[in-house]
């Protein structure tokens, strides 16, 4: 019994180390993509930045595209979490909480938002990550459905103007995009531009 427990503990510890190393790879890759641009970053440079061997990167990700799409998924998951928190607050009476959560999550790191948008275009036809891109689109549709349901309830309560729910959602999206553009210009003025 004791050897089974210690064996299970070893397996859990190995999994924990594996996941920590995977996150280290993603963090290194993201920093390089933002600093150097996608095309100038290689799996070797990611490995060097993460302080591991190139072969170790391939134990986690078969291709550079898998690393790129993982960055996209992580970003979208963070937005999904924030929007869900905002929807819950909106349901509890803070009518602007969902829009605020959306704005804050998109504007917290405009350079990352821009990178993810660029990656979506770049990877749109990549067959090796088609399943992951579909997962991304499922998350986005779920976010949109949650927002539309919440907005419909706010319209029904008379809190928001009675127009189709997607008008409100798209207005928030357009404002976030406009704000992101202003933030990008400000970042460019200071000389810290992102090369993609």
Predicted regions and their residues:
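Hydrophobic/aromatic-rich alpha-helical bundle segments in the mid-to-C-terminal region
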Residues: 113, 156-196
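Short hydrophobic/aromatic patch on the recognition helix
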Residues: 50-61
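Amphipathic alpha-helical packing segments from all-alpha helical-bundle domains
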Residues: 80, 84, 127-159, 166-171
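Amphipathic alpha-helical segments used for helix-helix packing
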Residues: 108-131, 181-188
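Basic, helix-initiating cap at the start of DNA-binding domains
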Residues: 1-36, 40-49, 66-69
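Short amphipathic alpha-helical elements of helix-turn-helix/winged-helix folds
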Residues: 28-32, 105, 175
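Short, basic, alpha-helical segments at the C-terminal edge of helix-turn-helix-like DNA-binding modules
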Residues: 73-79
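Hydrophobic alpha-helical connector segments
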Residues: 70, 84-112, 168-172
């Amino acid at each position: 019994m004791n050897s089974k427990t210690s064996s299970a503990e070893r397996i859990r510890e190995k999994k924990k180390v594996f996941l920590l190393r995977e996150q280290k790879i993603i963090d290194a890759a993201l920093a390089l993509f933002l600093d150097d641009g996608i095309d100038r970053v290689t799996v070797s440079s990611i490995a060097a930045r993460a302080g591991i061997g190139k072969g170790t990167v391939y134990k986690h990700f078969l291709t550079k595209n898998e690393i790129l799409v993982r960055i996209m998924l992580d970003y979208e998951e963070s937005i999904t979490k924030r929007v869900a928190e905002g929807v819950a607050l909106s349901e509890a009476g803070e009518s602007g909480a969902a829009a605020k959560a959306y704005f804050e999550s998109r504007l917290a790191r405009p350079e990352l938002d821009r990178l993810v948008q660029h990656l979506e275009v770049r990877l749109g036809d990549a067959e090796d990550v088609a399943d992951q891109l579909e997962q991304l689109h499922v998350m986005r549709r779920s976010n949109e459905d949650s927002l539309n349901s919440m907005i419909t309830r706010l319209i029904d309560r008379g809190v928001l103007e009675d127009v189709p729910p997607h008008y409100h959602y798209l207005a928030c999206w357009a404002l976030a995009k406009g704000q992101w553009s202003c933030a990008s210009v400000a970042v460019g003025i200071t000389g810290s531009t992102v090369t993609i």
